[in-house]
Amino acid sequence: MLTDGSYFHLHLVSDSTGETLITVSRAVAAQYANVSPVEHVYPLVRSQKQLDRVLQEIEESPGIVLFTLLESELVNRLEAKCQQINSPSLSIIGPVMQLFEAYLGASTTGRVGAQHTLNAEYFKRIDALNYSMMHDDGQHVEGLEEADVVLVGVSRTSKTPTSIYLANRGIRTANVPLVAGIPIPHQLETLKKPLVVSLHASPDRLIQVRQNRLLSLGAGAGNDSYIDRQAVTDEVLLARKLSAKYGWSLLDVTRRSIEETAAAIMKLLADRQRQRMSE
């Protein structure tokens, strides 16, 4: 058993980019805050020679081995070696593929990296990313009607990172800051197509994040309106009033990660689309 503060070797072996392995393993490793994985990522492992080099490194630094390999000979060799050196191994996609095969009554194509084919979904993500970068932080508001989602909120409510995250899911996302004393763009008042989501956070949380931001910029944490409690509270209240006035969806991001915020927005978007289809 590992003790607090220790580390372990985590070997990620893939015949493609390794993105699936990295995402899954980091999500699981995050649940064990007292130990740290040392990641060894081996992408594009598609031959016996390439696998030999991987097996040598695993033998030199034994640990958990996760893999996404479709070639059965490579899988058998990897599993045999792991068993020999007592390193636990697991295919991340194997059980999922077996479930699909049992339900669909069809075997897989065995096509390596099929999920990375340049299909319509890929180009949809690229289009969404381009759109979101062009419409970040209130830029080009004349194009807001072309968005799937428009995020609004006061400073430091994670509008930009949430926009990029959603864009990576193929969702065209614009974001517009709500600033005290500055009227909102008139385009926001008449939007029909996009889902407008107003991101909110508690004044305490906003002050904390803004102070950290100022310190990172070397600006110090002076008592200006950016972090003044009353001023920040007024900003939050103004944002809520605007949301109520225009019927924007409210989402409290005080204790949400970017991923959780994006997931909540995607649910709102899906619910809205289902409602429109039923009308």
From Swiss-Prot:
Key word Transferase present: yes
Highest taxon of source: Bacteria
E.C. code: 2.7.11.32, 2.7.4.27
Enzyme kind, highest EC tier: transferase
GO function terms (MF aspect): ADP binding; ATP binding; phosphotransferase activity, phosphate group as acceptor; protein serine/threonine kinase activity
Keywords noted in UniProt: Kinase, Nucleotide-binding, Serine/threonine-protein kinase, Transferase
Residues binding ADP, per UniProt: G153, V154, S155, R156, T157, S158, K159, T160
InterPro entries: Kinase-pyrophosphorylase, PPDK_reg
HAMAP family assigned: PDRP (MF_00921)
Family of this protein: Belongs to the pyruvate, phosphate/water dikinase regulatory protein family. PDRP subfamily.
Protein known as: Putative pyruvate, phosphate dikinase regulatory protein
Lineage of the organism: Bacteria, Pseudomonadati, Pseudomonadota, Alphaproteobacteria, Hyphomicrobiales
